[in-house]
Amino acid sequence: MQPTGPEGSVTSDMPEKGPHAQEPRKLEARLTDADRLYRAFVASGAGATLVLITLIGVFLLIGALPALRTAGLSFLTTQPWAPDGQPPKFGVAAMMFGTFVSAAVAMVITVPVAVCTSLFINEYAPRSLRRGLTSLVDLMAAIPSLIFAIWGLFLLVPLLQPIEDWAVAQFGGWMPLMEASATGGSLFNAGLIIACMAIPITTSIIREVLAQAPRHECEGALALGGTRWGMITAVILPFGRSGIVGGSMLGLGRALGETLAATLILSIAFEIKPRILENGGITVASGIAIEFRDAQELGLSALMAAGLALFLVTFAINFLAALVANRSRPGAGA
Amino acid sequence: MTAPETKALPSTSGTGERRPDTDAGAGPPRKVPPRRRPRAWRWTDMMETAGSLVAAFFLTWLLFTRLLPFRVMPVAFAVVWYALFLPIHWLVTKDGQGRPAAKDRLVTVLIGTGAMFAFAPIVFVIGYVGYRGLKVLRPNFFTETMQIVGPLSKATEGGALHSIIGTLEQLALATAIAVPLGVLTAVYLSEIQGPLARPVRLVADAMTALPSIVAGLFVYSLLIKPHLWLQSGILGSLALAILMLPTVTITAEQVLRVVPGSLREAALALGAPYWRSVLLVVLPTARAGLATAVILGMARVVGETAPVLMTTGGTTVLNTNPFSGHQDNLPLFVFTQIRSSQETQVERAWGGALILLVVVLLLFVLARIAGSAGSGRRRARFPGRGGQRRGR
Amino acid sequence: MTVPDVQHTRPMPEADARPAGGVLEGVDVSCWFGSRKVLEGVGIKMDAGVVTALIGPSGCGKSTFLRTLNRMHELVPIATLAGSVLLDGDDIYGAGLRLTEVRRRIGMVFQKPNPFPAMTIADNVAAGLKLTGTKVRDRDELIEASLRRAGLWNEVRNRLDAPAGGLSGGQQQRLCIARSLAVSPDVLLMDEPCSALDPTSTRRIEETILELKDQVTIVIVTHNMQQAQRVSQHCAFFLAAENEPGRVVEQGPTEQIFSDPEDPRTADYVNGRFG
């Protein structure tokens, strides 16, 4: 790229006749010194963020290495947690199972409720209530999980326990997985509480996506004489499908990382228990919260390995959510 | 084009709100026809619904008292009642108005029910926490600590001063760490868009998935376990800041991106260097959104228990120095008290929970106010005299 | 009319003095966006005391050319250019002039009014001073003078502390003009300043332009033939053939361009036969 000086060219009113083999000139002094300083300063801030965040991942990985080396592949299949024992015996199988089961219970409740609530706020609620309900959902999303957890522990679980006992008594004999020697501190109940926390955040995201459904198409559907439900199935749900998936995934990420509900509700048991109404279970997050105090050298490393595993799972889910959400384009999908 | 469109022009959007009598105010008093409010439902619809409800109720009653061997439980009764109501309602509307209408009606009921399940917890949570919290909250709750409180003390004795102070200090420190860094990163992402932008955005996105307990574990195993720094408030702030940073960065970037490019161009066209245009035009224009982002970030971490559980240590005495010595905070206070076997301790936990709830509510309201104050600052237009400047 | 001194400013002209403002000259300017050439070999001299209008159909490169005149063109990351732009004989792209100095001396008014929404009316006028770090003796006086020059003073004198967003579109555009004038530019570039405004506001802006033309060199891009005739004395007609960069087909005194153009394409365009 060669700079072309003004001396190299001639002004002409009829330029199409002149020869024009110009090259773009290189510009100088785009930035003042102060601007260079500003750029360097801001870039260093961004760099610090990058370094800090990367450091966490790297540090977790390094910290987890001794435990992973000790346990090998059995880390994924072992249920008990005794990393500081002789010989050390530990793995994330029970924790992961508990995490996934409680999250699954939570999502089975969360997704339909969140979709219903979003549709209710956007399409069914009176106009005057809409803003208030939206704020309420956003507010709910801000309430600390601790409060949901103690509320569940003291109000919801005692309330549900007789019903669960009744269900176990009625169905326990002949339906698989419904037996339980004792109820209350079960993965099901933990999942239920987690659902209460996940519903607001999921609703808030889904509602926002569904609200962006093209109004003229909705009105088109209504103008054809369709019912409200007809409009929802024809326009809004197809439009918001990926938003629903994305929002649910984010809710799932929240549910997987939830610590308090599981710590307070579950009767701790490091084993895989398919009978979800029965007491006992553990999740990764609550396992870390409970075990860290007594953890020795290898124990801490094992906890970091568990934390890393959890992080990888939540990261993968977030990533998928972003992928799905980005694919959503108005009018796409039938 | 014209910014005041929204308030100057009569609303052209919400077509439903225009009323026939709005422009009659100025004219001579004439007979205004009664205002009609179109309704989507009719009285017969109500009757159908009510009838279905009654029919389902008696059917359920019949089932439970005469036909089934189940013990009668109110909850089960309600569930069966609801389950029977749906098909009855469907059949009734289908008979009267045809299949699509029946389906629509059925779905309306289902969606309403679903929404109820979402809104019920909030009412019950706030109500229950308020009820139990108010029982123990006395003024001394804000002035005393748990230092001299024994297992036999009454629930109204002692207080959470040490936890409140701890929460405030830790929150302030976490904000002081996360917000400048986050906003700086956001400025980089949106205004400079340099080569670091892609990796930074990638890791920030990834870190929003970081479970809060893992942030605590990170600080614990990096600093506390190797005895580099003992458990203290600042370490709790660090863990909270790690949780805040990606959220603040991403929200702030979104807020900055909304600032119209024409404003940046206008600033640059006046001869401003980049840094001044960002500092004096872009950031002030986005300040409402930035404030909202910051406050919501604070609301998000103020109730986080898992990370502070591992990092601040927890204590029953007042420690105003966040940099050394164990420090308590509200979530930790609630968590330790609620797990106690003493009834009075548990009672006290609800007091802490109520305060925490109020703090979150306050932050939320603050965020709303900051957000709505943003677009077009509405200040009292006072009739100043020509050329005189005020309010500087 | 009194205009206070600002750093770097030459004294303001008396009523009968030679017109103030800088002489701007584009010399053989070509522009690219990436590898696409959008403008080729444009040379226009924009004299002080003369309003120069750039006309032509959409997409012919007039706005691009205008943006090269105060180095706004390079804000687009893939934009490049060749040739040079001389302000009173100095190349604004050369090493001698600082970028920010160039933009301060060559102001710009945009198509859509863009007052800073976070500032009051007065702060908006004085924004350029703050943004360039310029100190003035009497800020209030400068604000008043700038607003007077833009013809907005009487409308806003009682609400200088009100947010700028509360003004009408035409008032906002004149506020933007006042904002540009407050840093005492030598040249004022206007990129279709009236295209977003109603006819009344348009007329007010045109009056403002005519009042300003002896104080500052004005270059205006417009789609409105009548406007070009009303406000400008010099006129350049841009045209771009399909898939070719834009060029200046013809330029000269406005009267001649509109009454007796040399090029048939110019005649077609100014008589509304295409474009």
Positions of the model-derived regions?
Chain B
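Interhelical loop and adjacent transmembrane-helix boundary motif
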Residues: 308-358
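Generic hydrophobic transmembrane alpha-helix motif, especially the helices
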Residues: 205-242
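Cytoplasmic-entry segments and transmembrane alpha-helices of multi-pass inner-membrane transporters
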Residues: 104-109, 181-219, 247-254, 380-392
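Membrane-cytosol interface at the C-terminal ends of specific transmembrane alpha-helices
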Residues: 175-194, 198-201, 232-269, 273-281, ...
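Transmembrane alpha-helices
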Residues: 274-312
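C-terminal transmembrane helix and the adjacent membrane-cytosol boundary/short C-terminal tail
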Residues: 256-257, 268, 336-392
